[in-house]
A protein has these predicted regions:
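Short, charged helix-helix connector/hinge segments
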Residues: 29-34
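Short, contiguous alpha-helical
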Residues: 11, 35-83, 123-164
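Residue-level recognition of alpha-helical structural elements
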Residues: 6, 38, 67, 93-100
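Acidic/histidine-rich alpha-helical segments that form the ligand environment
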Residues: 80-124
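Short amphipathic alpha-helical segments with heptad-repeat character
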Residues: 10-14, 46, 50, 98-101, ...
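Extreme N-terminal tail/first-helix region
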Residues: 1-18
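A short, mixed-charge helix-start or loop-turn motif at secondary-structure junctions
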Residues: 2-6, 89-94, 134-138
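Structural signal for well-ordered, non-membrane alpha-helices
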Residues: 17-28, 53-57, 61, 105-119, ...
Length: 164
């Protein structure tokens, strides 16, 4: 069930980030950078999650400023996420494992600060400006943060189980 207020959103964000952080904290770079059969590594997944927090914050700021909000990013449509994610992996190829972990932590802190500073009515009082759907900024924040943290943890556990 999706969070419906700031307190719930902060609680689920902290819970899911802590779980992911503990999971990746013990992984060394050789494990994190080993690609699976589809060419995707744990490092790729974690870097992707950090990136999507910045995407969300950019969408929010663009909407607040009355700018065009590019979903998911300029030059891409939602049905082109595979291409977007592949292009993102190419852009992030030179990030090492410690850089990725730091980017995730920094992203979490930015998301947490956004939620803490955003008034409740701005988070859950109506659709996010520029989003062209009914999702509130709080729901978008949950999708970019806690939901992505949870799916990354699941991917990592599956990857480790399959490898071991």
């Amino acid at each position: 069930m999706a969070a419906t207020n700031k307190a719930e959103l902060l609680a689920i964000a902290l819970k899911e980030y802590d779980a992911l952080s503990k999971l990746i904290g013990s992984l060394d770079a050789s494990v994190a950078t080993k690609a699976n059969d589809e060419g995707v590594s744990i490092k790729d997944i974690v870097a992707h999650r950090a990136h999507w927090i910045d995407l969300f914050l950019g969408w929010y700021m663009d909407g607040q400023a009355g700018k065009t909000v590019h979903f998911p990013a300029e030059g891409y449509k939602w049905n082109e996420l595979k291409r977007y994610n592949a292009d993102l992996r190419v852009q992030q190829v030179d990030m090492d494992w410690s850089d990725v972990q730091a980017a995730l932590h920094k992203g979490f802190l930015k998301l947490k600060a956004f939620v803490e500073e955003c008034p409740e009515d701005k988070l859950y009082g109506g659709p996010m400006k520029g989003a062209n759907n009914a999702w509130t900024p709080g729901r978008w924040a949950e999708a970019a943060g806690p939901s992505h943290f949870r799916s990354a943890s699941k991917f990592i556990r599956t990857t480790l189980r399959t490898a071991g």
